[in-house]
Regions:
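Alpha-helical transmembrane segments of multi-pass small-molecule/ion transporters
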Residues: 1-325
Length: 325
């Protein structure tokens, strides 16, 4: 195993713990690490490119071949969860509209690229996951401003054109470039370049988490009952996304790999993108709901995968896989 492979394996195995550590460092030393925020857009563009090298335009055809699960995932991601976030914000924080804005922003952003890693670990349908991630990533420059405009309207003043442009730079263009390289090299780039970039993509995510956490420091230094309530709301919505994805899969009578993908894609969000947007376009209070999520998202996802494996269908699927070896 090469040094890069060892580093990648170490980061992948300990990512949940490392994320918590980087969040704590960012909160503890915000003055030292806050300058990183000036480079978050470039860092995010690199992370998107590196994580999108695993598929091309042909993989997107999976959406057309099995449209219903993908449509349901998108409905949960961009209709159900944003509406629930809006309702939670208005119900719990009627005097703090910026907290409501932060909750809605958190559930307007696309599904997380990290879901590719977790779906693979969870024995899910990786082809479907890749299609969802790529399509959602490409649509993000248009879906995010539209969701904020429809749900928040005049509550939020934002430069929509600038936001779309920055999302194109951070998300859409890097993803399209990666897909084009995959297509032109007939997939060779996934076996050669992607593994070499993988540890650097994970390190980039940790740096982004560190930068995002610096924005939480002012809040956590003066913790209040309202902030505790906000943290609980963020955690509850996070769990709800996973739960709705899994229950939707059960209603569709989907097989276990599809159920894993629907649950994880519905629950994992691209928090780094939300934090970059919150820092660039909104007051500080908007950042807190978004920036706090990385503290527990990865650890929660690890627990969700174990729960899925412990279900009756999960045990049967894993046992069948062991017998076929």
């Amino acid at each position: 195993m090469s040094p890069l492979e060892k580093l990648d394996a170490f980061l992948g195995k300990h990512m949940a713990v490392l994320i918590v550590a980087f969040v704590l460092v960012g909160i503890t030393f915000p003055d030292i690490f806050s300058p990183i925020n000036d480079y978050t857009m470039a860092l995010f563009a690199f992370m998107t490119f590196a994580n999108s090298l695993g598929g091309g335009f042909r993989e997107m055809a999976d959406v057309a071949r099995r449209p219903l699960p993908v449509v349901v995932i998108f409905a949960i991601l961009h209709v159900v969860m944003p509406l629930l976030a809006l309702a939670a914000g208005k119900l719990l924080f009627p005097e703090a509209p910026l907290f409501t804005t932060g909750l809605v922003l958190e559930y307007a952003i696309p599904t997380g690229v990290a879901s590719l890693l977790w779906v693979s670990i969870g024995r899910g349908n990786t082809s479907m996951c890749l299609s969802v991630v790529l399509l959602d990533t490409l649509l993000a420059p248009f879906v995010i401003p539209l969701t904020l405009r429809v749900l928040l309207g005049s509550v939020v003043e934002m430069d929509t054109a600038s936001m779309v442009g920055n999302l194109m730079i951070m998300v859409a263009i890097p993803a399209l470039l990666a897909m084009t390289l995959f297509q032109t090299t007939r997939g060779r780039v996934a076996a050669t370049v992607k593994p070499r970039l993988a540890p650097f993509a994970k390190l980039t995510m940790l740096v982004l988490v560190l930068a995002n956490a610096t924005g939480c420091a002012p809040f956590l230094r003066d913790i209040t009952p309202t902030l505790v309530k906000l943290i609980c709301a963020v955690f509850a919505l996070c769990l709800l996304g996973f739960f709705l994805g899994y229950q939707a899969a059960r209603l569709l009578k989907a097989d276990f790999p599809t159920a894993v993908t629907m649950s994880l894609n519905s629950g994992i969000r691209n928090i780094a993108a939300g934090s970059v947007l919150a820092i660039a376009y909104f007051p500080g209070d908007v950042l807190f709901p978004v920036a706090f999520s990385p503290l527990f998202l990865q650890a929660t996802t690890a627990v969700i995968v174990k729960i899925l494996h412990a279900t009756k269908t999960g045990k049967a699927f894993l046992q069948q896989g062991e017998l076929s070896k």
